[in-house]
């Protein structure tokens, strides 16, 4: 049976898409998939870090809008889907160990520990369908790429040991589209809401748009301005500063596609 095209993947309902991912039949990015369904960033920490991280999310709701938290040891997000298993239902994960480079895998079952707590954090991929419905084209989708993401100079509010930079995702738009995009995305605070910044990237510490820290470069036309939204990769940048002994995250751009609609929250 031939592999499904990306267009065919985009038409699949989330439970079917997750089954495909669970079997290891798709390991690519999820931008443009799930259509109107919420996508979630993933952070998995040992229980000793959970309360601190929960407070960090509460202090930084633009970057870390919390959609669900698992019980210790449970790999399930009951609020997001009946059959979700965070050990296998994302296309790619990063396993982070102190002092080592992250390892990317497509299943984390062998790494799972009894005291793990999983956090689902809202993702801007969720509001992309609303932008498309408003007639706003998205360059990274047109090019079949992941979105471009950057470590900014915008500091997060610290929580105990957790502090560091806000990561932002960038989408280039014309001025009229930018105004409409702000109006549209401000309706969805649980998927990062309105942009944190638009215009000169140097003002938020980004030197070169052609060299994103995560994701793929997305070209900017002469008549466009870059818009920057808070991004759920922020926890990875912050945790890299403090280096817990072990934690697991999604690989940037490779999200959990849930059964919840983005406009239900």
Swiss-Prot record:
Keyword vocabulary terms for this entry: Lyase
Highest rank taxon of the organism: Bacteria
SUPFAM superfamilies assigned to the protein according to its UniProt record, in alphabetical order: PSTPO5379-like
Molecular function GO terms recorded: lyase activity
InterPro entries reported in the protein's UniProt record: D-Glu_cyclase (IPR009906), Putative_hydro-lyase (IPR038021), UPF0317 (IPR016938)
Pfam family, one: D-Glu_cyclase
EC number annotated for this UniProt entry: 4.2.1.-
Family the entry assigns: Belongs to the D-glutamate cyclase family.
Family matches, as NCBIfam families: PRK05463.1
Protein name: Putative hydro-lyase PLES_32121
Protein source organism: Pseudomonas aeruginosa (strain LESB58)
């Amino acid at each position: 049976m031939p592999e499904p095209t990306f267009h065919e993947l985009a038409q699949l309902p989330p439970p079917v898409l997750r089954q495909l991912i669970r079997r290891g039949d798709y390991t690519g990015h999820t931008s443009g998939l799930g259509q109107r369904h919420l996508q979630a960033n993933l952070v998995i920490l040992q229980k000793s870090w959970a309360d601190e991280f929960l407070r960090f999310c509460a202090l930084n709701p633009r970057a870390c809008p919390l959609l669900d938290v698992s019980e210790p040891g449970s790999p399930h997000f009951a609020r997001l889907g009946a059959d979700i298993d965070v050990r296998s239902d994302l296309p790619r994960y990063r396993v982070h160990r102190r002092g080592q480079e992250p390892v990317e895998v497509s299943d984390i079952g062998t790494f799972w520990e009894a005291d793990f707590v999983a956090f689902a954090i809202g993702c801007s991929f969720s509001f992309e369908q609303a932008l498309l419905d408003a007639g706003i084209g998205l360059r990274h989708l047109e090019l079949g790429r992941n979105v471009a993401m950057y470590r900014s100079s915008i500091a997060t509010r610290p929580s105990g040991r957790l502090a560091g930079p806000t990561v932002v995702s960038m989408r280039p738009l014309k001025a009229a589209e930018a105004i409409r995009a702000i109006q549209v995305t401000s309706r969805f605070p649980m998927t990062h809401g309105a942009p944190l910044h638009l215009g000169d990237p140097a003002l938020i510490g980004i030197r070169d748009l052609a060299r994103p820290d995560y994701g793929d470069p997305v070209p900017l036309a002469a008549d466009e301005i870059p818009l920057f939204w808070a991004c759920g990769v922020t926890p990875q940048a912050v945790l890299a500063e403090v280096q817990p002994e072990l934690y697991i995250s999604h690989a940037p751009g490779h999200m959990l596609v849930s059964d919840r609609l983005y406009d239900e929250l």
